[in-house]
């Protein structure tokens, strides 16, 4: 039997992960990114950008449920949601499950990513691109949040790692723009890497976001594809109470929503804000 081709991730220099490639479905460089989608027996279809795994069919539900349901249920009455990035459609899929949301705007820098994922990762979007509440904007995320006349209750930054095109979504200019178009008591969330390996990302985000929001923190989830420990998600708002809602309040909102999830539940919601001591110490040691 011929040995299977292996795809190696290049996120870290000294160690990493690899996937056996059963079948390459798509591989092409777009104007902005090097995109590959392939099949793996353990994780299903895998998408990688610029040598870094972005999503897999097997475990994407953890990431997308936590990025959407935590801020939306904490907010309690979000009507207008902005997604920055998210071209694979799974973030959109989870937001559309909230029937009280009236509009969902998604800003993606690369139209090619959307078309590729719609064809090759259909389970990610699950038809959500056809939701009448959805609007796609092809634009740079920093430009959009600093120019739009729209305002939003929840902003979800489904950004890549802070390298290449994704770097701009970790800048003060982006955070300032998000504050600009976020409604009072609105919530901003963003992926912030695996904190054991990428601690500086969390520290940098905390420092920058604190210039614009009165309550800045993180919550976490364990996602197998993003190896190295827990993944952290940045959280920023001017309503300090939203990060500290009781499990009972979240439970009532969860039941009213009719959601049925595979990872998220109200107990996970409140527990997710408990951070390991090494991250708490790192954040506390930074100058205010």
Curated annotation (Swiss-Prot):
Catalytically driven reaction(s): S-adenosyl 3-(methylsulfanyl)propylamine + putrescine = S-methyl-5'-thioadenosine + spermidine + H(+)
MF-aspect GO terms: spermidine synthase activity
Enzyme kind, highest EC tier: transferase
Transmembrane intervals: none
Record organism: Escherichia coli O81 (strain ED1a)
Annotated metabolic or biological route of this protein: Amine and polyamine biosynthesis; spermidine biosynthesis; spermidine from putrescine: step 1/1
Keyword Transcription listed: no
Subunit structure, as described in the record: Homodimer or homotetramer.
EC number(s) given by UniProt: 2.5.1.16
Protein known as: Polyamine aminopropyltransferase
Start and end residues of each PABS domain: 9-238
Keyword Transferase: yes
Cellular component terms per the entry's GO annotation: cytosol
PANTHER family registered for this protein in UniProt: SPERMIDINE SYNTHASE, SPERMIDINE/SPERMINE SYNTHASE
Record family assignment: Belongs to the spermidine/spermine synthase family.
Annotated InterPro entries: PABS, PABS_CS, SAM-dependent_MTases_sf, Spermi_synthase, Spermidine_synt_N, Spermidine_synt_N_sf
Listed HAMAP family: Spermidine_synth
Record's keyword terms, sorted: Cytoplasm, Polyamine biosynthesis, Spermidine biosynthesis, Transferase
